[in-house]
Structure formats: structure tokens, C-alpha cells
């Protein structure tokens, strides 16, 4: 099923033909929005998008397409936060396998304020709710990214503010969140 918050966009699961566009958007976001570029320890999934998101039935990459271009992404991976750098108590609370981690929620600058991120995150949460084995939906974000903190506070509950810990080093202010698990219904991604 496709979703569109705005008639000029198509929101759907990624296909192999979306990989290059999704990767380009992600790498551009690391450089222009976050200012630190590609970090292999943090961004392995970006190099192997097919293996990470398309080949695993419990993982998902969603894209928003506009005029044939990928302009927004959101991913779901079966993984919790890793200790270190994240606190041990978070790694224990959100274990791999039963945690759907929301990742790579990026919208190209010229396409913001159209409801793309919010709709993609809702689709990702619905996917987690209809995928067997997930008990929780977790994410962390760098609140230095423009609009990130307000956006996530409108959709999720803070579970730990790591800004004082410096867990990712200078220039990264991490806050950890949990999204309430939606009540399962028909699979919105596969319908």
C-alpha cells in the first residue's frame, strides 16, 4: 500500500531501484545536517542497504519519492542500542531481536514540512506492530539537528537524555526515545 501525506509524494517500502537515491540522501544528511560525514562504526547499513533492509523480513526501509527522486527515508531494524557507547541499562531494556529500532529518518531540506517524516514514522511503527517478535519501538536522535527534538517529543516518550554524558563525542547531543507500540491491525506496508 502506498501512503501520501501530500499528493506530490509517494511513500512506500524501498525497492532495489531506490538504493542509490536513499544512500545519497543519507550520506548527504551525515555531512550537511550532522557535520561529521560517514562514520563506518555507525553507518554500516548505509553501505549495505539491500542486505540490511531489503533482504531481512523483520527490517524495512521506507522512502518518499517525488518526481522519481528519493527525498525522505525511514528505516526499521531489529536492534537495540549498543553498549558502549549507550548506557548498559538501555541496551538491557531494548534488546536485539525484540526491539524495533527506528533509524535513518531523513527528509531532504526542500521537502520538509509536508508530513513526510511523521507519516513514514507511523508506517514504520505500524510495521513493527504487525511483525512478529517486536515488543518495543526505540530510537535515539541527535537533538542538534534542526527540528529533531521537537519532532520526536511530539511522537515519542523520552527514556534517557544523554546530552550530559557525551556518549557520541563532541557535536552530538543524543536523546533516547520510545514510541508506543500501535495496536496491531492490517499490515499497512504489505496491503
Which sequence ranges carry the predicted segments?
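Conserved beta-strand-loop-alpha-helix junction that forms the acyl-donor binding cleft
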Residues: 112, 138-148, 166-170
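Residues forming the Rossmann-fold NAD(P)(H) cofactor-binding site
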Residues: 114, 118, 122
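Actinobacteria-biased recognition of intrinsically disordered, low-complexity terminal regions
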Residues: 1-4, 185-191
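Acetyl-CoA-dependent GNAT
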Residues: 13-104, 108-109, 121-123, 127, ...
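Conserved acetyl-CoA-binding loop of GNAT-fold acetyltransferases
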Residues: 152-162
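Short hydrophobic/aromatic beta-strand or adjacent loop that forms the aromatic wall/cage
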Residues: 59, 171-178
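Conserved GNAT acetyl-CoA-binding A-motif
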Residues: 121, 128-140
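Conserved hydrophobic beta-strand within the GNAT/NAT acetyltransferase core sheet
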Residues: 102-105, 137-141
Amino acid at each position: 500500500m502506498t501512503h501520501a501525506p501530500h499528493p506530490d509524494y509517494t511513500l512506500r517500502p524501498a525497492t532495489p531501484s531506490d538504493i542509490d537515491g536513499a544512500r545519497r540522501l543519507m550520506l548527504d544528511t551525515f555531512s550537511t545536517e550532522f557535520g561529521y560525514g560517514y562514520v563506518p562504526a555507525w553507518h554500516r547499513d548505509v553501505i549495505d542497504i539491500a542486505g540490511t533492509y531489503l533482504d531481512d523480513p523483520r527490517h524495512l526501509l521506507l522512502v518518499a519519492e517525488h518526481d522519481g527522486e528519493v527525498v525522505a527515508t525511514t528505516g526499521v531494524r531489529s536492534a537495540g542500542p549498543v553498549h558502549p557507547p549507550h548506557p548498559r541499562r538501555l541496551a538491557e531494556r531494548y534488546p536485539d531481536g525484540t526491539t524495533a529500532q527506528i533509524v535513518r529518518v531523513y527528509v531532504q531540506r526542500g521537502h520538509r514540512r509536508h508530513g513526510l517524516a511523521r507519516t513514514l514514522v507511523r508506517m514504520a511503527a505500524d510495521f513493527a506492530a504487525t511483525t512478529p517478535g517486536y515488543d518495543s519501538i526505540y530510537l535515539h536522535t541527535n537533538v542538534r539537528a534542526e527540528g529533531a527534538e521537537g519532532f520526536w517529543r511530539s511522537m515519542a516518550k523520552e527514556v534517557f537524555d544523554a546530552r550530559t554524558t557525551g556518549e557520541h563525542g563532541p557535536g552530538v547531543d543524543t536523546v533516547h526515545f520510545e514510541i508506543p507500540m500501535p495496536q496491531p491491525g492490517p499490515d499497512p506496508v504489505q496491503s
